[in-house]
Amino acid sequence: MCASATRPQPSASNNVKKIILPDLVSHCTFKLRHNRHRKQVTTETKKWLFKDGNLLGQKERAYHGLKCGLLTSMCYPDAGYPQLRVVNDFLTYLFHLDNLSDEMDNRGTTTTADEVLNSLYHPHTWRSSARVGKMTRDFYKRLVLTASPGAQQRFIETFDFFFQSVTQQALDRASGVIPDLESYISLRRDTSGCKPCWAMIEYANNLDIPDEVMDHPIIRSLGEATNDLVTWSNDIFSYSVEQSKGHTHNMIPVVMYQEGLDLQAAVDFVGDMCRQSINRFVEEKARLPSWGPKIDQDVAIYVQGLADWIVGSLHWSFETERYFGKSGRQVKASRIVDLLPRQRLP
């Protein structure tokens, strides 16, 4: 069920100039680590991304401000160089797709999905000159060299879900719909792009975990709790930028609309949900069953990879210029965000 958003959002947000962020960094006690291959991988990914000369001017500046290599390093700290390079290429490319989908109507999203998914499902036979297709085939051919069959399958399936969800997001945007909270959470778990990143944990750490283990309810719950923390905290951190563009695919306006909250109360509401997701992760981790020494060891590495994503994404959000410009560290210390002014429509 979805509610129409053509009615105005709660008026309290129109006059608010600042918000106070929840202190999620202090609530997360996982150890932050870095991968020693970060600088080399960042250099090589930049060459890969820019080799056709298609990212110039503002897009090039946005790439440097993104600091994707730092995110990759924090979230995959134990990966070897070849695997880290593929993961960093993918994450950089994923942010590129995210920017595309944010600006696309439904037709544009579908075209991108066709290019990407055909390149994944048919990497050796699909022929296209589209740059996004060539980039997809390039990193995926490197991934399959060492990824387990299960990791490959989970990567493709979850990336397919990503495109289905961003298509729905584009339709919602075009029709001016704000979904209810339950519908939003379900959709956002796929639009976040997190699920293929969890398959990358398997790949980056050379894991071959049986499908029946990966499908276990506790393993799924751990992935979901991580997805929720990364996604919902991102909704908080990106709110200033998104509201300046009039975007509503964000949990904060959804909560304001459904619960009748003012802006700061909605931020606090989502912050509480983020804390609960970290708590849920810790509780579910303590409930993990045993599948025998070898599988237990691989599962422990996978679960550690999820924890690395929780702590890494939180700290990276204040290092990248994507959300707070060059003021990220100041915002991290004060937790005060000056909201950007609304952009005028052309």
Swiss-Prot record:
Cofactor annotation: Mg(2+)
Pfam families noted in UniProt: Terpene_syn_C_2
UniProt-annotated site: Plays a critical role in the stabilization of intermediate cation, residues: F95
GO MF terms, alphabetically ordered: metal ion binding; terpene synthase activity
Sites where the protein binds Mg(2+) 3: N234, S238, E242
Binding residues for Mg(2+) 2: D98
Protein name: Sesquiterpene synthase Agr1
Protein's gene: Agr1
